[in-house]
């Protein structure tokens, strides 16, 4: 039954407009519309209501058409069609054929054997160049199931639907089943849907149309949501990535039906289907280490080129500093890399760069904020060698001759004079410091007494002690009191010691 179904669909795809109208009229369906609408209607009829009478009618129309073709004289030259591109062979008036579908000697099932891996309702323009999508480093393409095909609105409604019926080959099914799981329920080999603008000027990045919804067979597929935005008035952004359809598909020879719902707001979009193998950041890092290491001598020549004297410049550069700290994570570099298109010598860590782009792909250099795609990344062999040789520095300087020297942080030097160290003891009850005395080793010890006292040791003047806790007024008053006391002692003799008043409410500090 499956073989007959595939054969019937191949026959339907070879029909002219008149054949399609006869087939649809045979089952009582509408015969109006463009050719791609009639083809879609007939394919849906074959897919969901293929009775023996309908199959007999399809075969009769097919044999009638090719019997007439074979009886004709030599055909006009024609251009063969790409089996993966769905082109409308008639203009919008439905009268003038643009390109003949096939010649009489072409086996039509062979020509259209791959058409089931395409969108029956999504015609592409033959005269326009093909839409190209950018390569995704984390997705290694195995097969192209459907080339980028434009989403064509069928009416004036804002919400459009475009169905697709396709089947996987046994080899493709085997690849998916035998692939490892990246995480529970997610295979490494996947069937992904990619959507982009229909712009042929340059490779296009993935871009979703408004109100997008993807239905695979009888279940809706999850589409990445919007990033939360805290800024008022700023439209939230959406990560546009390939949509994995594998978990909702029939992994057998049965046909799969995909329906893309999208908002028609003036912009043109194209869709494509690919069989891919998803890679991890560690696999990309290993590949980069294998094919992306730049020889140290080439890196050294680049340093010389950067520091070469420019005769037109009035400023001569004698060296350039390069940090060994990754600007992404502020940690020491382990795998220094940069893009070949970058003008700077500063590197970032390839490990963290790949991990960050695996979560949120931007592929922007963290040093110069310019594009740094994966296929332009290189590992700096010279800086890798420096990292292994210089483990105690966080920065180096490249010199004019290509050599380098580490830049280490200078130790703080003491600005105190090279003299005797003054030992300041605790103050007595009157707030006076004991006078220091110089011992034999040059250190000063504390002795009883108050006030600044100078000492002589081996004919050299001693150091003065200044109490920094007292202000200038209090120190001058203390000096006057001491002078008065000394005069009184000289005249009247020694006076009794004063007793320091002690308040009961005070608590000692120790």
UniProtKB/Swiss-Prot annotation:
It comes from Homo sapiens (Human). The keyword DNA-binding applies. This is E3 SUMO-protein ligase PIAS4. Functions as an E3-type small ubiquitin-like modifier (SUMO) ligase, stabilizing the interaction between UBE2I and the substrate, and as a SUMO-tethering factor. Mediates sumoylation of ALKBH5, AXIN1, CEBPA, KLF8, GATA2, PARK7, HERC2, MYB, TCF4 and RNF168. Plays a crucial role as a transcriptional coregulation in various cellular pathways, including the STAT pathway, the p53/TP53 pathway, the Wnt pathway and the steroid hormone signaling pathway. Involved in gene silencing. In Wnt signaling, represses LEF1 and enhances TCF4 transcriptional activities through promoting their sumoylations. Interacts with AR, GATA2, LEF1, TP53 and STAT1 (IFNG-induced). Interacts with TICAM1. Interacts with MTA1. Interacts with PRDM1/Blimp-1. Interacts with TRIM32 upon treatment with UVB and TNF-alpha. GO terms for cellular component: chromatin; cytoplasm; nuclear matrix; nucleoplasm; nucleus; PML body; transferase complex. The lineage of its organism: Eukaryota, Metazoa, Chordata, Craniata, Vertebrata. The gene is PIAS4. Residues 443-453 have a biased composition (Gly residues). Pathway: Protein modification; protein sumoylation. Changing residue 347 to A: Inhibits TCF4 sumoylation. Inhibits beta-catenin-mediated TCF7L2/TCF4 activity. No colocalization with TCF7L2/TCF4 in nuclear punctate structures. AR- and STAT1-binding. Belongs to the PIAS family. It comes from the Eukaryota. It is found in: Nucleus, PML body. GO terms for biological process: central nervous system development; double-strand break repair; hair follicle development; limb epidermis development; negative regulation of canonical NF-kappaB signal transduction; negative regulation of DNA-templated transcription; negative regulation of protein localization to chromatin; negative regulation of transcription by RNA polymerase II. Sumoylated. Lys-35 is the main site of sumoylation. Sumoylation is required for TCF4 sumoylation and transcriptional activation. Represses LEF1 transcriptional activity. SUMO1 is the preferred conjugate. A motif (LXXLL motif) lies at residues 20-24. There is a cross-link at residues 35, 128 (Glycyl lysine isopeptide (Lys-Gly) (interchain with G-Cter in SUMO)). Zn(2+) binds at residues 342, 344, 365, 368. Its EC number is 2.3.2.27.
